[in-house]
Curated annotation (Swiss-Prot):
Coiled coil: none
Protein function: Allows the formation of correctly charged Gln-tRNA(Gln) through the transamidation of misacylated Glu-tRNA(Gln) in organisms which lack glutaminyl-tRNA synthetase. The reaction takes place in the presence of glutamine and ATP through an activated gamma-phospho-Glu-tRNA(Gln).
Gene for this chain: gatA
InterPro entries, sorted: Amidase, Amidase_CS, Amidase_dom, AS_sf, GatA
Domain of life of the source: Bacteria
Taxonomic lineage of the native organism: Bacteria, Bacillati, Cyanobacteriota, Cyanophyceae, Nostocales
Name of protein: Glutamyl-tRNA(Gln) amidotransferase subunit A
Recorded family membership: Belongs to the amidase family. GatA subfamily.
Length: 486
């Protein structure tokens, strides 16, 4: 499937209609879903209606935006009015939101075509999309491998070209890690850049919505559409949003002397040698484009994982207290009193990993342990943020691997939670600091599985991240390789 800009030109020149483009996406979804399981819900009827509205505008001589008529996948933890939003959980099995999330509303206003809701780890808690209550998504590059998580459905859908772009959410790496595993571009914006209104909460101080795309430019276009202040979200930032793709040119090179820092702590034990080699070669490419390379130390980077697994479950234990079978979603049958209904609903409605994190969070917040765990974790979070602040006084952009490994086999880590958690080792500190970060393809291992390069920027420097990523993308061909799904 072509890029956003290419499809836009085809629509404007009336070489193709939005309905034709949408029909092509729906046919591809129908053909691939028995193997991939990227989508929990395909919204064919709504998609064709939205596409028809775009065609009517074109026929009337009206101007259309870049996203008009473009097939988009939506992670199923973003509320969509009249369309089921399950968070891949039994407890929200029949939940149909009465309102639209700000991010999806902005896409609808831009004329984008929603082709369906994508699979995820239940309540976005996981790193492989194996925690979904409904189905396990496969990696398009190797169907026996996981696509990453928690936004594995969105990553797989974009990688396999079931849709042009997709939305995901990132709490500790849930956009960037699956982007790395599936060989696509994934961006976690600065905390507060994109409204969280209508995003089902996991850990409110960490959650952020962002784009998946096959190219850096497409990711930039999608982020432009969803970014901006929203009075419905008290954490939404009041800042001007630049046109991220405005300075992209075929021979683009970063302006001025770009200083890039290699995060020293991300190399060493636990990092696959093939990943290390690919990232090192990517740094060489950036240096050849004129970047000045520095070795940077972020000494508390390694404390990100334990810090996250106190803070995120603590917030989750509070956020998920609302699911009790009273107002919406699943309600356990045969309960003989209110307390029994609560306990049975939560015991049978939540999956194993969600219950594990609720218990961890409840323990960390309990009397006698709050200071030792939650309060201490918040102090370490501040120290991690300070390390990044010091680094950005020396360099403009930080680089490191997105994940220590390439995609692992389905079932390989399901009985070992700690091993699963370690796949987000390099993405989590960025969420704790609220920084923007982007993953893009930088190579493949000897089994043909993609490797991701992570670029980390200072607060609200998405523009700089996109420019560096675009320069690297134009100097390489990794993004041109596509999975052959047999």
């Amino acid at each position: 499937m072509a890029s956003i800009r290419e499809l836009h030109q085809q629509l404007v020149k009336k070489e193709r209609s939005a309905v034709e483009i949408t029909q092509e996406a729906l046919e591809r979804i129908e053909a691939l879903e028995p193997k991939l399981h990227s989508f929990l819900c395909v919204t064919a009827e709504r998609a064709l209606e939205q596409a028809g509205a775009v065609d009517a505008k074109i026929a009337a001589g009206e101007e259309i935006g870049l996203l008009a008529g473009i097939p988009v996948g939506i992670k199923d933890n973003l509320c969509t009015k009249g369309i089921p939003t399950t968070c891949a959980s039994r407890i929200l099995e029949n939940f149909v939101p009465p309102y639209e999330s700000t991010a999806t509303q902005k896409l609808a206003d831009a004329g984008a075509v929603m082709v369906g809701k994508t699979n995820l780890d239940e309540f976005a808690m996981g790193s492989s999309t194996e925690n979904s209550a409904y189905q396990v998504t496969a990696n398009p590059w190797n169907l026996s491998r996981v696509p990453g998580g928690s936004s594995g459905g969105s990553a797989a859908a974009v990688s396999s070209q079931e849709c042009v772009v997709a939305l995901g959410s990132d709490t500790g790496g849930s956009i960037r890690q699956p982007a790395s595993f599936c060989g696509v571009v994934g961006m976690k914006p600065t905390y507060g850049l994109v409204s969280r209104y209508g995003l089902v909460a996991y850990a409110s101080s960490l959650d952020q919505i962002g784009p998946f795309a096959n190219t850096v430019e497409d990711a930039a276009i999608l982020l432009n559409a969803i970014a901006g202040h929203d009075p419905k979200d008290s954490t939404s930032l009041k800042v001007a949003i630049p046109n991220y793709a405005a300075s992209f040119k075929p021979d683009f090179k970063p302006r001025g002397q770009l200083r890039i820092g290699i995060v020293k702590e991300t190399f060493g034990e636990g990092l696959d040698s093939v990943v290390e080699q690919a990232v090192t070669k990517a740094v060489d490419v950036l240096q050849s484009l004129g970047a000045e390379i520095h070795i940077i130390s972020c000494p508390r980077f390694r404390y990100g994982l334990p810090t996250y697994y106190i803070i995120a479950p603590s917030e989750a234990s509070a956020n998920l207290a609302r699911y009790d079978g009273v107002k919406y979603g699943y309600r356990a049958p045969d309960a003989d009193n209110l307390l029994s209904m609560y306990t049975r609903t939560r015991a049978t409605g939540f999956g194993t990993e969600v219950k594990r994190r609720i218990m961890i969070g409840t323990y960390a917040l309990s009397a006698g342990y709050y200071d030792a765990y939650y309060l201490k974790a918040q102090k370490v979070r501040t120290l991690i943020k300070e390390d990044f602040e010091k680094a950005f006084r020396v360099v403009d952009v930080l680089v490191c691997p997105t994940s220590p490994t390439t995609a692992f086999k389905a079932g390989e880590k399901t009985t070992d939670p700690l091993s699963m958690y370690l796949t987000d080792l390099m993405t989590i500190p960025v969420n704790l600091a609220g920084l923007p970060s982007l993953s893009l393809p930088c190579g493949f291992d000897d089994q043909g599985l993609p490797i991701g390069l992570q670029l980390i920027g200072n607060v609200l420097r998405e523009d700089q991240l996109f420019q560096v990523a675009y320069a690297y993308e134009q100097a390489t061909t990794w993004h041109l390789r596509k999975p052959q799904i047999s």
